């Protein structure tokens, strides 16, 4: 079945869905628009800053995307692959991907075939943690394009809800939906290393999504607690990319980076008790940590905001960090802009705009020292969690390689005791 028109619902309380508006396929099948319904215009809230409460058809401003916050409700590479394999839609437009992502997607939005009742794609109960081994085997079958039976299809179907390139699915742990991420034939034990990286980040004062390692036959999987769920309630969330594009003037390229996101949090974050300032400063620590552990996959989809007070002026909190792990690339630049030297993976670059995160230069330098002290203990921390010596040696080539180790060793907070004119410094990766 082709879907040229579908309907958007808000599922903060899944037992009482609220109709949001109508979705329409546009741009020759490469975009999806939204027009709010009358009740949502009267009682709802803008789903993102580019989706104001106006009685118009909101059109996507970038090709190949659904409009505004709706783009975060669609799957990405792995999810699309699952949908193609499981559902086999007659057409592969954005509208099909939005619909077949099902009911339990990221955030609190749902897609229905009806504006009168919430009628999402039919779904089965999530597999339980005790079925993780079987689920892993099904994922490997899909990756190898091997046939699977109906029971295996039902187990895997929830994997169409999420983005990213690597194999994942939803799994039930004690009645709560968690994300499970599988080993993907990498040369190192990525699930275990991600758990070690996330728990190391927590030691550095970074709020992270809860993770657990699941032992499987010959490998590990990683389960991640969903921060967009609180009991039976769902939290409306948007990616950093959506938030930053929403404030971008039409025709211009968005400034996708840490400093810009910090300034957005200053403006639209929860201001009561200085919560937005706390989030801005945590974002700085996250940036420094990512640089020092060689996490260069810190792109716009790997940061998110939670609308904890959807109808308030200052409604957003910085979501817990996720997908934090050393990428072992040594490329010397981040995906997200760091500072005046753009994406260069240097502490000097991180410090270049530190005042945009609500710090003085001296305060920011003290935070860098704190993160350095934690990262200096990375090897023992990883070893304690079971990372093997071969993987530790492989990671050490990057984390303790000269470009990053020299920055940890040579960073001097006294250099930032008083503001001074900045000169561009040569990258240690050059």
Model-based region annotation:
Residues 1-296, 300, 304-430:
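Phosphate/dinucleotide-binding and metal-coordinating scaffold of catalytic cores
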């Amino acid at each position: 079945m082709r879907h040229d028109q579908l309907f958007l619902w808000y599922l903060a309380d899944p037992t009482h869905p609220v109709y949001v508006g109508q979705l329409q396929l546009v741009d020759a099948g490469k975009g999806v628009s939204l027009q709010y319904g009358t009740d949502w215009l009267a009682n709802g809230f803008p789903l993102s800053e580019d989706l104001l409460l106006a009685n118009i058809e909101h059109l996507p401003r970038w090709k190949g995307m659904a409009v505004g916050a709706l783009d975060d409700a669609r799957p990405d590479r792995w999810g699309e692959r699952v949908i193609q394999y499981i559902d086999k839609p007659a057409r592969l437009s954005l509208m099909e991907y939005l619909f077949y992502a099902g009911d339990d997607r990221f955030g609190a939005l749902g897609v229905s075939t009806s504006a009168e009742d919430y009628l999402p794609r039919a779904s089965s109960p999530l597999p339980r943690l005790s079925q993780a081994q079987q689920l892993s085997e099904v994922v490997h079958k899909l990756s190898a394009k091997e046939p699977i039976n109906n029971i295996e299809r039902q187990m895997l179907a929830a994997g169409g809800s999420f983005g990213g390139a690597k194999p994942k699915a939803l799994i039930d742990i004690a009645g709560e939906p968690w994300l499970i991420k599988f080993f993907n034939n990498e040369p190192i034990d990525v699930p275990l290393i991600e758990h070690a990286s996330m728990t190391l980040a927590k030691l550095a004062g970074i709020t992270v999504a809860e993770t657990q390692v699941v032992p499987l036959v010959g490998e590990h999987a990683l389960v991640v607690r969903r921060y967009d769920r609180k009991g039976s309630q769902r939290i409306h969330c948007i990616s950093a990319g959506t938030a930053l594009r929403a404030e971008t003037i039409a025709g211009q390229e968005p400034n996708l980076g840490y400093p810009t996101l910090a300034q957005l949090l200053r403006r639209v974050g929860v201001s009561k008790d200085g919560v937005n300032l706390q989030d801005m400063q945590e974002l700085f620590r996250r940036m420094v940590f990512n640089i020092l552990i060689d996490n260069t996959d810190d792109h716009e989809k790997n940061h998110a905001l939670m609308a904890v007070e959807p109808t308030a002026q200052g409604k957003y909190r910085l979501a817990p960090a996720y997908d934090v792990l050393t990428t072992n690339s040594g490329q010397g630049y981040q995906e997200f802009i760091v500072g005046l030297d753009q994406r260069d993976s240097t502490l000097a670059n991180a410090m270049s705009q530190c005042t945009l995160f609500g710090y003085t230069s001296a305060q920011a330098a003290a935070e860098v020292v704190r993160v350095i002290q934690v990262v200096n203990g990375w090897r023992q921390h990883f070893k304690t969690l079971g990372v093997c010596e071969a993987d530790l040696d492989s990671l050490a080539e990057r984390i303790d390689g000269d470009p990053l180790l020299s920055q940890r060793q040579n960073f001097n907070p006294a250099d930032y005791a008083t503001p001074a004119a900045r000169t561009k410094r040569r990258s240690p990766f050059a």
